[in-house]
Curated annotation (Swiss-Prot):
Its EC number is 3.4.23.23. It comes from Mucor thermohyalospora (Soil fungus). This is Mucorpepsin. GO terms for molecular function: aspartic-type endopeptidase activity. Transmembrane segments: none annotated. One of its GO terms (biological process) is proteolysis. The keyword Protease applies.
Amino acid sequence: AEGDGSVDTP
């Protein structure tokens, strides 16, 4: 996700 601080993207 975007901007959620997950492992996917920052």
